[in-house]
Amino acid sequence: MNNHKLHLLPLFILITGLVTLTAGCKKKDMSLKLNEPRNIRGVVSYKRSFPDLNDAHLEVAKKIGISPLADREEAEAMKEKLTHITDNEFYAVDSLTHSIPYLVPRASALLDTIGSNFLDSLAAKGLNPNQVIITSVLRTENDVKRLRRRNGNASANSAHCFGATFDVSWKRFKKVEDKDGRPMQDVSADTLKLVLSEVLRDLRQAEKCYIKYELKQGCFHITCLLYTSPS
C-alpha cells in the first residue's frame, strides 16, 4: 500500500505544478478599456488663464536663451548648448516645417514636466493615456522669414528664436496604445484640452512658465521662466 502511494507521489507533484502554472498564466483581459472620467473641470477662461503676451515671452526668452541663429547650419554648431527634442515617453514631436527640434536644457526639462504631469493627470481622472504634441520649437532667422511669407501675421520678433519657447497643440494629441494590444477607448480632443489646461494653469501659477492661448494656431505658446531649473 505504501509503495503504491510512493508511485503516485511524482504524478501528484506534476499535476499540482501544472495547476499552479496555469493559474499563474491567467489570460490578459483584451476587452475594450473604457474611460471612467472624473473631476474634469478645465479652466474658467482660456484667454484669462493664459494671458501672457509676446513681449513678456520675449523678455524672458532673451535672458535664458541663446542668441538668434541665422540658419540651420548655425544651429547644428550650437548643439552642445541645446537639448534635442524628439518623441519620448512624455510627448510626441510633430513634423516641424518652420522650426528645428532643439531647446535650451531648462526649457526641455519643463517640456518633460508638462508631458509627465499630463499623463499622470489623465490616469488620475480615469482617462486612457495620450501624449501632448509639440508643434513648434526653435526657429532660425530663415525659418521666421519663410513663416512670414506664408503667414503675414507671424511676428518678426519671435520668442521661438531663443530656444526657450515651444508650442503645444490643444487640437491634436497622440493616443498611447496598450503594449499588449488591448483596445483602448478614445478620449475626445475637447476632453484632453480641458485636462491639459489644468496642468498648464498649475505650472503657470507655480511661476514655471509664461503661457499664451493661441486660438488661430490651435496651440499653447509656452516660454520657460528663469526660476525653472532642469530636473
PLM region spans:
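Bacterial Sec-dependent N-terminal signal peptides
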Residues: 1-33
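Conserved small/polar residues in nucleotide/adenosyl-binding loops
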Residues: 227-231
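Short, surface-exposed glycine/acidic/tryptophan-bearing loops
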Residues: 142-167
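Acidic helix-start/capping segments at beta-turn-to-alpha-helix junctions
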Residues: 127-144
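Structured segments of extracytoplasmic/periplasmic soluble domains
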Residues: 110-125, 150-153, 171, 199-206
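Second-shell loop/turn segments in exported
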Residues: 93-105, 132-134, 178-189
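Active-site acidic/histidine clusters and adjacent loop/turn architecture
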Residues: 80-128
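Extracellular/periplasmic catalytic domains that process cell-envelope and extracellular macromolecules
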Residues: 126-128, 158-164, 213-216
